[in-house]
Amino acid sequence: MVTLSLAAGMLEAQYFGVYLQGQRVGYALYETTRTVFAGKSAERSRSLTVLKIGLIGSEVDMKIDSETITVANRPLRMRFLTSSAGRTQTVEARFSETSIEASINNGGTLSNTTIPLPKDGRIYDDPITALQAQPGIAGKELNFYIFDPSSVALMKNRAFFGEKEDMDGVSIAPVIVEDPRLTTKIYLSGKGDIVKVGTSIGVEMKPLSKAQALEEIKNTGTRPDLAEVTAIRPTPTLNNPQTTKFLKLKVSAENLRGMPSGDFQKIEKSDSGWTVSITQPRAEPSKSISECAKAQPTWLKASHLIPSDNPKMVALAKKIVGSTTDTAKAAEKIRTHVNSIMTPDAGIGILRDANEVLKTRVGVCRDYAILTATLCRAAKLPAKLASGLVSFDGTFYYHAWVEVFTGSKWVPYDSIPSAPEFSATHVKLSEGNVDTAFAFTVLSGAKIEVLEQK
């Protein structure tokens, strides 16, 4: 059996096969080597993940390569390269005593951001790297942070031993790693070797030899589709979801700690989940663009992947909005424009800057949402991203849209459908800028019960 040890300071490359629905879809590599950095003895940790999966009927090829330089158990530099369908994002993070200075190159668009350094946990580039560095988990809980290169944000993780499970006839208590985005289970042998890794989105990793891991993935037909694997089918079945004006659901999942309430979504905690009541927004008078901008200045600012201060974005937003001064009408003009110029393409597996989205005019819901939010802010419309679930055909899929402040309410706008009506089948799980809206929880063991539909 090939295993990966959690013993700190491993100096050899270790390989995993990556599987989705039992089919191998890629491989992962972890290695730690000795090096010299700034004249000091250091450790260089590298992780590489290569994936070939399906997404909404498209084929997605993706590579994530990261490197961390650590001196005396303290990270000094992290580098990430994410590539998919000819697009790349590179992130270099340099650590000081108090902050992280991150430089981002997203498809040629350069930006910088500063992240305060947390005081309650170390920072790693991957949970397996974190456990390698802190192998003594037995009998206690570990807290640490993962640097997410997609959102350029820190994700607080908690690791602890779970209840024992049967693993090929052997009773093993997995190490459970809770991340805001998903839950990972790491199964260890009695010697502390990793024998399997499972995630809440159905992706599994198993140790392989180098030759096995690098062996070409055979084309067996349709690739496993991540959108279908993570889809949630409610009971009873939804009728005519796109014309739904009110929906009351009971949502439960192993890792669902809470959900945001808002002007059109109300949340109540129940014994085994959350009761969610969603009302379709109605056309209401809204305030002027200047009034709304004055009331919500925070949501006018440019942020990661949302370059609303770019002169080209400002000029385009002005052209779309024209002489319109009503916030809701201006937002609908932008939503309609984005829908008219974009073509769905799920083959690009990385988050992209709005400039690149506008240039290529292809993408998935998150690309539509990023471009819509950027143009709204460029037009001085307060806007934030929202993500969660939506049902267009009776099944709930993960989705993204935007919300615009129209004077008294945050009104949702979805640029994917051609029709302007926003159905009550949008279930919001997170909101904000990219770092929070797209760090939502992928639900584990999710169940949705339809309590009422109108």
State each model region's role.
Residues 1-5:
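Bacterial N-terminal signal peptides
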Residues 9-111, 129-285, 437, 444, ...:
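Acidic, serine/threonine-rich low-complexity disordered tracts
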Residues 85-86, 181-182, 341-344, 365, ...:
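Solvent-exposed loop/turn segments at secondary-structure junctions
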Residues 106-122:
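Acidic/charged, solvent-exposed loop-and-adjacent secondary-structure segments enriched in E/D, K/R, S/T
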Residues 123-124, 288-363, 371, 433-438, ...:
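Secondary-structure boundary elements
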Residues 205-218, 292-293, 336, 378-381, ...:
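Active-site rim recognition segments
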Residues 344-347, 351-352, 385-395:
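Catalytic cysteine-centered active-site loop
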Residues 347, 363-380, 385:
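Catalytic cores of peptidoglycan-degrading enzymes
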